[in-house]
Swiss-Prot record:
A cellular component annotation (GO) from this entry: extracellular region
Organism annotation: Diploptera punctata (Pacific beetle cockroach)
Protein name per the record: Pyrokinin-5
InterPro entries reported in the protein's UniProt record: Pyrokinin_CS
Free-text function comment from the UniProt entry: Myoactive.
Length: 17
């Protein structure tokens, strides 16, 4: 659930914003 890979971040900004 994220534009890139923000599944572990909780929102949409993942580890590779």
């Amino acid at each position: 659930s994220g534009e890139t890979s923000g599944e572990g971040n909780g929102m949409w900004f993942g580890p590779r914003l």
